[in-house]
Amino acid sequence: FAPVNVDCSDHPKPACLQEQKPICGSDNKTYDNKCSFCNAVVDSNGTLTLSHFGKC
């Protein structure tokens, strides 16, 4: 059973689509989608991780 991961290698992006596929981060914040989550991961210098898919 591998830990759940999100590939953020193609981020950050200047703009994210308004796609609703919520992701819960380790900061207990719900991100709208992978793009906004990955941008936050980059901003956090990699300290932010995925808690689970779906709202927190």
Swiss-Prot record:
Give one Pfam hit by family name.
Kazal_1
Check the record and name the CDD domains matching this protein: KAZAL_FS (cd00104)
Q: Name one GO cellular component term.
A: extracellular region
Q: Which UniProt keywords apply?
A: Disulfide bond, Glycoprotein, Protease inhibitor, Repeat, Secreted, Serine protease inhibitor
Write out the GO MF terms. Answer: serine-type endopeptidase inhibitor activity
Query: Which InterPro entries does the entry mention?
Result: Bifunctional_prot_inhibitor, Kazal_dom, Kazal_dom_sf
Compartment(s) where it occurs, according to its Swiss-Prot or TrEMBL record: Secreted
Q: Report the SS bond pairs.
A: C8-C38, C16-C35, C24-C56
Gene3D superfamilies in the cross-refs: 3.30.60.30
Q: Which intervals hold domain Kazal-like? A: 6-56
Q: Which domain of life is it from?
A: Eukaryota
Glycosylation site residues: N45
* Alphabetized SUPFAM superfamilies for the sequence: Kazal-type serine protease inhibitors
Q: Which residues bear the site annotation Reactive bond 3?
A: Q18, E19
Q: What is its main location?
A: secreted
Q: What domain comment accompanies this record?
A: Avian ovomucoid consists of three homologous, tandem Kazal family inhibitory domains.
Q: What is this protein called?
A: Ovomucoid
Task: Give the classification, highest ranks.
Answer: Eukaryota, Metazoa, Chordata, Craniata, Vertebrata
